[in-house]
UniProtKB/Swiss-Prot annotation:
Signal peptide: none
Protein name: Zinc finger protein 426
Keyword terms of this UniProt record: DNA-binding, Metal-binding, Nucleus, Repeat, Transcription, Transcription regulation, Zinc, Zinc-finger
Gene3D superfamilies given in the database record: 6.10.140.140, Classic Zinc Finger (3.30.160.60)
Function of the molecule: May be involved in transcriptional regulation.
Family annotation (PANTHER family): ZINC FINGER AND SCAN DOMAIN-CONTAINING, ZINC FINGER PROTEIN 709-LIKE
SMART domains per UniProt: KRAB, ZnF_BED, ZnF_C2H2
C-alpha cells in the first residue's frame, strides 16, 4: 500500500491516525527514517508522528518536549535536501519552543485541551504540503493560493485571507475574558508559516488560541548567543540544542543498532508509548499492528506475495513504493538532485546518504573500535567483522556471508552463466568488478605501497591492515580474556578457542579445525600433495612453514 494512502490522520483528535506501521517505530521518529528503502516522494507528513487525543494525554512534559525536538529535526532534514516546501504550521508553532518561556503561572492547573488548535494546524498542514522538490505553481495540492494585496502574505485558504484582511482593516483581535489578553486568529498565522507565538510587549498580542498562552521573552533578555551564527537564546539548554544544528550531533539513538547518541532513554519511553496499542497480531511471528491494513501488508513477508509486477522485466515487488522506485531504473528518472554537486539519485535514501559525504557527517559509530559510518546498514555490516556473524547462507554449498549482496554475487557462480570466469585459473565470480580484483592476484600489479617499509599490495584494504603492524593498532579485543588483534579474521579464530567451535571438518577422517588454513594443510596429508619444493635439494613439503624450516639447513 502506498504511503500516500495512509497519510490523512490528525495529530491530536479523537479520530484514528495512521503511523505507517510498515516502517520501524524508531524510523518514524528519528530523522534517519528518511532513508527508508520504501520511501518514494517524501513529504513532512511521511516523517511526522501522529497521536490521538488519548495518546497525547499519556505523554508527560518531557516526552512532549522530545516530540517537539524530533519534529523540528525531521523538518530541518527535509528542508536540507529538498526544494521549496511551505513550512507546516506545526513546525512554525514548535520552532517557538526554543525562544519561548511560559508566562508566570498561566499554565498551572490548565489541561492541555488542544483539540481545536491542533485540528486547525492539521487542516492547514494537510493543505499546505507538496512533495520534496515539487512546488506547484500558484496552487497547493490543486487548491488556489490566495495572497493579500496589501502586504503580499500568501494563504492556502480563502477564509484565512478574509480573516487576515479583516484584522488589517479593523484591528480586531480575540479577547481572553479570563486573563484580559488579546489574541490574533490562529488561521492568519498558520497559513503563512509565521511563528505562532510572536509577542508584542507593548500591545500584549499573541497569535495562539486562548487554550494555551506563552510569552516570548524580549531580545534583550536572550543572553546566550551562538558563536557560529549569532542567534540568541533565553537559556543555556536552548543554546546547546541549537548548537547541534552546526556540529551535526544527533539527538536520538536508532534503537536497533545502538550508536552512542544521547537521550536514548527518553526516546525508548516515547517509542513504547506509541506502540502501546497494537491489537492486530500476526499469527506467524506475533508482531503487532495498530490497523488491519498494516497487518495485511506485513503478511506478504510470510506468504511471499508480490502483487506489483514490472511489465518491462517481470520483476515483482511486495510494496507499491518499491515498484515505483524500480520503474526508474527503466526510465532513467532521477528526481533527487544534490544541490552541492548536481549528482542525481533515483530514490531519496541515496541522496540522503550522499549529502553526508559533503558534510562529513558519519553519525553511526562502532562501540568496539570507534569507526564511524554514513549509514546504519554499513555499521551493521561492520559490527559483523567483530562478531563473526554471517547470516546469509548459500543453500547450494553452505557458504556463509556477512552481507546479502555478497551472497547474491556468489549465487551466480552456481548458475550455468560463467561470464565472470577467470581464464587463468577457472575461478568464477558473481560480478565483473570481483573478477577484475581477482586478476590482480595473477599479475604483478600491486598499486598500493606502504610508505614505511615499501611493501606493495593488490588492494587498498590489505594496505590498511598492514599499516597496523607499524602503528601497533589492535582494534579487535576479546571480551573473554582481553587479548587484542589487528585482524578481524584472527580475532574470530581466537574466539573459537573459548567457544570450542571447529567449523572445518575433514570428510576423510572426521578431524575438525578452528580455521580454514589448518584444515587445508591437514587435507594434504590425505592426498600426499607436497607442492612446496626446495630448490636446493628438491625435497618437497605440504606446507610452506615446513619448507622454510628445511631451507634453514642450507
Amino acid at each position: 500500500m502506498a504511503a500516500a494512502d495512509l497519510s490523512h490522520g490528525h495529530y491530536l483528535s479523537g479520530d484514528p491516525v495512521c503511523l505507517h506501521e510498515e516502517k520501524t517505530p524508531a524510523g518514524r521518529i528519528v530523522a534517519d527514517c528518511l532513508t527508508d528503502c520504501y520511501q518514494d516522494s517524501v513529504t513532512f507528513d511521511d516523517v511526522a508522528v501522529d497521536f490521538t487525543q488519548e495518546e497525547w494525554t499519556l505523554l508527560d512534559s518531557t516526552q512532549r518536549s522530545l516530540y517537539s525536538d524530533v519534529m523540528l529535526e525531521n523538518y530541518k532534514n527535509l528542508a536540507t535536501v529538498g526544494g521549496q516546501i511551505i513550512k507546516p504550521s506545526l513546525i512554525s508553532w514548535l520552532e517557538q519552543e526554543e525562544s519561548r518561556t511560559v508566562q508566570g503561572g498561566v499554565l498551572q492547573g490548565w489541561e492541555m485541551r488542544l483539540e481545536t488548535q491542533w485540528s486547525i494546524l492539521q487542516q492547514d498542514f494537510l493543505r499546505g504540503q507538496t512533495s520534496i522538490g515539487i512546488q506547484l505553481e500558484g496552487k497547493h495540492n490543486g487548491r488556489e493560493l490566495c495572497d493579500c494585496e496589501q502586504c503580499g502574505e500568501v494563504f492556502s485558504e480563502h477564509s484565512c485571507l478574509k480573516t487576515h484582511v479583516r484584522t488589517q482593516s479593523t484591528g480586531n483581535t480575540h479577547d481572553c475574558n479570563q486573563y484580559g489578553k488579546d489574541f490574533l486568529t490562529l488561521c492568519e498565522k498558520t497559513s503563512t508559516g509565521e511563528k505562532l507565538s510572536e509577542f508584542n510587549q507593548s500591545e500584549k498580542i499573541f497569535s495562539l488560541t486562548p487554550n494555551i498562552v506563552y510569552q516570548r521573552t524580549s531580545t534583550q533578555e536572550k543572553s546566550f548567543e551562538c558563536s557560529h551564527c549569532g542567534k540568541s537564546f533565553i537559556n543555556e539548554s536552548y543554546l546547546q540544542a541549537h548548537m547541534r544544528t552546526h556540529n551535526g550531533e544527533k539527538l536520538y539513538e536508532w534503537r536497533n543498532y545502538g550508536p552512542g547518541f544521547i537521550d536514548s532513554t527518553s526516546l525508548s519511553v516515547l517509542i513504547e508509548t506509541l506502540n502501546a496499542k497494537k491489537p492486530y497480531k500476526c499469527k506467524e511471528c506475533g508482531k503487532g499492528y495498530r490497523y488491519p491494513a498494516y497487518l495485511s501488508i506485513h503478511m506478504r513477508t510470510h506468504t511471499g506475495e508480490k502483487p506489483y509486477e514490472c511489465k518491462e522485466c517481470g520483476k515483482a515487488f511486495n510494496y507499491s513504493n518499491s515498484f515505483q522506485i524500480h520503474g526508474r531504473t527503466h526510465t532513467g528518472e532521477k528526481p533527487y538532485v544534490c544541490k552541492e554537486c548536481g549528482k542525481a539519485f533515483t530514490q531519496y535514501s541515496g541522496l540522503s546518504m550522499h549529502v553526508r559525504s559533503h558534510s562529513g557527517d558519519k553519525p553511526y559509530e562502532c562501540k568496539e573500535c570507534g569507526k564511524s559510518f554514513l549509514t546504519s546498514s554499513r555499521l551493521i555490516q561492520h559490527i559483523r567483522t567483530h562478531t563473526g556473524e554471517k547470516p546469509f547462507v548459500c543453500v547450494e554449498c553452505g557458504k556463509a556471508f556477512a552481507v546479502s549482496s555478497n551472497l547474491s554475487g556468489h549465487l551466480r557462480t552456481h548458475t550455468e552463466e560463467k561470464a565472470c570466469e577467470c581464464k587463468i585459473c577457472g575461478k568464477v565470480f558473481g560480478y565483473p568488478s570481483c573478477l577484475n580484483n581477482h586478476m590482480r592476484t595473477h599479475s604483478a600489479q600491486k598499486p598500493y605501497t606502504c610508505k614505511e617499509c615499501g611493501k606493495a599490495f593488490n588492494y587498498s584494504t590489505h594496505l590498511k591492515i598492514h599499516m597496523r603492524i607499524h602503528t601497533g593498532e589492535k582494534p579487535y579485543e576479546c571480551k573473554q580474556c582481553g587479548k587484542a588483534f589487528s585482524h578481524s579474521s584472527s580475532f574470530q579464530i581466537h574466539e573459537r578457542t573459548h567457544t570450542g567451535e571447529k567449523p572445518y571438518e575433514c570428510k576423510e577422517c572426521g578431524k575438525a579445525f578452528t580455521c580454514s588454513s589448518s584444515f587445508r594443510i591437514h587435507e594434504k596429508t590425505h592426498t600426499e600433495e607436497k607442492p612446496y619444493k626446495c630448490q636446493q635439494c628438491g625435497k618437497a613439503y605440504s606446507h610452506p612453514r615446513s619448507l622454510r624450516r628445511h631451507e634453514q639447513i642450507h
